[in-house]
Amino acid sequence: MNNTAASPMSTATSSSGRSTGKSISFATELQSMMYSLGDARRPLHETAVLVEDVVHTQLINLLQQAAEVSQLRGARVITPEDLLFLMRKDKKKLRRLLKYMFIRDYKSKIVKGIDEDDLLEDKLSGSNNANKRQKIAQDFLNSIDQTGELLAMFEDDEIDEVKQERMERAERQTRIMDSAQYAEFCESRQLSFSKKASKFRDWLDCSSMEIKPNVVAMEILAYLAYETVAQLVDLALLVRQDMVTKAGDPFSHAISATFIQYHNSAESTAACGVEAHSDAIQPCHIREAIRRYSHRIGPLSPFTNAYRRNGMAFLAC
């Protein structure tokens, strides 16, 4: 087992030792996702390619670790329990995942058109298929929860500040849109990896794995992939904001070397692949965002993820 995680700029192939999904690309879909998450209306292709590489690398590493957990408990497939186990230390992101699983169950009820008779029949038969994701999560967390804090998340109505900020940003984006732009924006917001399930599975090269993820585990992986994109956009927007020198700011000269190169070096501008005045997120924004995030939860941080290996930390979980 290779214990060295990929660096932010590594390719998925080099990090995993497998040429996974290299003929399949989500770059086009990612451009739409990035737009809906706060990027410019026409996100840069080269930025989307870099984001795709980061997401792919992280998911391959996550799959490898989930497979190891599954193997330790003698299972033949990767299940939601394996992913929940890996996420158990990060309460905020685990809470977000549990809410997602609740919403998936709720949507399933609507799609299947469950009526009162169906619900009564399920109750009488002892079946709980209508809430299968919630039940999986609740049963598993109950089995490992020593303090009650994990189960308390099911009753937690705390506002998710990250989600709130994303919604407010989306609202600000739509203020200046005409009807055609708004329709395009709404369409972009509907995109997800879960709606491209077959392509997503091929992208991760699941068919070549000895221990494969089951259907619900794939749903969670698709969710985590989207959350990784969202967090990359969140962080890159902060980096871009910091790169704008503020008039009258006495500390504007004390920016990092990365920013100095961005402003003053033609080589740095060329490395971004676009003109510096573009309002789109650029590759250098993504790289700086990853550098900051990895440093923030580095080896000396008390909040280091339990499943983080020596290298880039997982963004979504």
Swiss-Prot record:
Glycyl lysine isopeptide (Lys-Gly) (interchain with G-Cter in SUMO2) crosslink: positions? K112, K123, K163
Gene Ontology MF term list: protein heterodimerization activity; transcription coactivator activity
Q: What does this protein do?
A: Probable transcriptional activator.
**What's this protein's family per the entry?**
Belongs to the SPT3 family.
Q: Which one GO biological process term can you cite for this protein?
A: transcription by RNA polymerase II
Domain of life (superkingdom): Eukaryota
Assembly behavior: Component of the PCAF complex, at least composed of TADA2L/ADA2, SUPT3H, TADA3L/ADA3, TAF5L/PAF65-beta, TAF6L/PAF65-alpha, TAF10/TAFII30, TAF12/TAFII20, TAF9/TAFII31 and TRRAP. Associates with TAFII31 and GCN5L2. Component of the TFTC-HAT complex, at least composed of TAF5L, TAF6L, TADA3L, SUPT3H/SPT3, TAF2/TAFII150, TAF4/TAFII135, TAF5/TAFII100, GCN5L2/GCN5, TAF10 and TRRAP. Component of the STAGA transcription coactivator-HAT complex, at least composed of SUPT3H, GCN5L2, TAF5L, TAF6L, SUPT7L, TADA3L, TAD1L, TAF10, TAF12, TRRAP and TAF9.
Q: Please report the organism this UniProt entry assigns to the protein.
A: Homo sapiens (Human)
Q: What is this protein called?
A: Transcription initiation protein SPT3 homolog
Q: Where in the cell is it found?
A: Nucleus
- InterPro entries to which the protein is assigned, alphabetical: Histone-fold (IPR009072), TFIID_TAF13 (IPR003195)
Cellular component per GO? Answer: nucleoplasm; nucleus; SAGA complex; transcription factor TFTC complex
Q: Which UniProt keywords apply?
A: Acetylation, Activator, Isopeptide bond, Nucleus, Transcription, Transcription regulation, Ubl conjugation
Where does the record place the modification N-acetylmethionine?
M1
Report whether Nucleus shows up as a keyword of the record: yes
Q: In which tissues is it expressed?
A: Expressed in all tissues tested including pancreas, kidney, skeletal muscle, liver, lung, placenta, brain and heart.
Identify the stretch(es) annotated as Disordered: 1-20
